[in-house]
Amino acid sequence: YLLGLSKSVRGALAAARKTRGFSPSQVVGIGVDTTGSSPLPVDRRNRALALDPKWRKDLAAQCWLWKDHTGWREAARITALAARHRPEYIAKCGNTYSSEWWWSKIWHCLNTAPKVFAAAYSWVELADWIPSVLAGVAAPEGVVRGICAAGHKAMYADAWGGLPDKTFLSKLDPKLAALRDRLYAKAHDAGTPAGRLCPEWASRLGLPEGIVIAIGEFDVHYGAIGCGVTEGTLVKVIGTSTCDCAVVSARRRIPDIPGICGIVPGAILPGSIGIEAGQSAVGDIFKWWVEGICGGGDELHAALTRQAAKLPPGAGGLLALDWHNGNRTILVDPLLTGLIAGFTLHTTRAEIYRSLIEATAFGARSIIERLREYGVPLERVVCAGGIAEKNPLLMQIYADVTGCTMHVAGSAQACALGSAVSAAVRAGAHPDFPTAQRAMTRWKKIRYVPNPARRKAYDRLYAEYRRLHDGFGGLDRKADYSRVMKNLLALSHP
């Protein structure tokens, strides 16, 4: 991470120098986004345990990337305990605690790598740690923690005094309760800076010493800012997985929403409530099929996309569930797995490829429907990330399936741009976030409008998707699948 930080910042400065009149001395702030929840064990000096030669080769001492689901047992136990004793802890995260989140990973480390856990003085979210390194923070107690990570992933809320109380944590494991004293008491929104650039890192990066460092947030949350998010906008950052974000005014009363990853005041923009949802695998599913199963690469991706674009909805009578890495929203179950129904002796690779794209679109529709069901205003959808940039077929299918016009972020690096917006506001280059967003963000001219005929076809196909989704997902324990395959054949041969 630190090598990548140096390389990317110096590379950005080198590119910027090609602009007439630019000088690094003009840079007034820096912002950082990362994946999350990605907790990192650190020592008393706020140094990553992985940098200690003793632990360098121990994977448990590395950053626990969000995608790791090995803490699913711990997550289930956290959910069960909270449901019995502290239901408010999980009410704002869909009533289910995820294996992708903070406490699940740290507890799993304690259970499976106790020596690493014992060696770690504290734990810091990657999104908080990198800004703290830039600021030269020499102890975990000095790290400015962001409400984005704390509120969405660590069951933090001012309403109950911050992190879960020690009584609750001790019921999980007394060592977690003891750790709480070495974590943090307060988390902040983007209105608070993480610090100022220290001399060492100013020299390493080639930036002015003392410039402001924006508070750390997760990639999709800063990506939402980089897409110009306002109330009524759903931002989808589509990559290996997809994460969705929306904001509503802090004055609006939003009920608890089952299956949603988090409803957290200040998590994206100060003065707004941040709402997060998502899908655990999207681009990774396409990569699995094209590269893992078909043995191809970029050329095959392109060829299958061209072939799939010529096919109608539900081509070949196929229907898939997009659960290859579990389901994040709305079922919050990492143990669910993928499924494709409707194979025949005539099924082609392109038909399967299209069915996988359609499955992720159906997953996206289920999220949009859940948000609207609970009163979240959604008037427009803005997509960012590599897939939104590169795959018009997927974007059109998403428009047809959801019935929403799909806009595309103006920047190919919307998450980094959102980080820069935050830094610009904190540095005083813009007076507030709305002003900075108007000046620094835009959408591309291209947009994907729903095709009415295909929309009708997808409505019928989505009904079959929900039959499988609700049955295998445990929402409908009396689900009848006896007509699914015949219905799929009928839909593919109208």
Could you tell me what each predicted segment is?
Residues V425-P494:
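Cytochrome P450 heme-binding "Cys pocket" and the immediately downstream C-terminal segment
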Residues A80, R86-E217, Q279, E291, ...:
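Gly/Ser/Thr-rich active-site cleft segment
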Residues L311-Q413:
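Activation-segment/catalytic-loop signature of the eukaryotic protein kinase fold
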Residues T19-W101:
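Active-site phosphate-binding/coordination module
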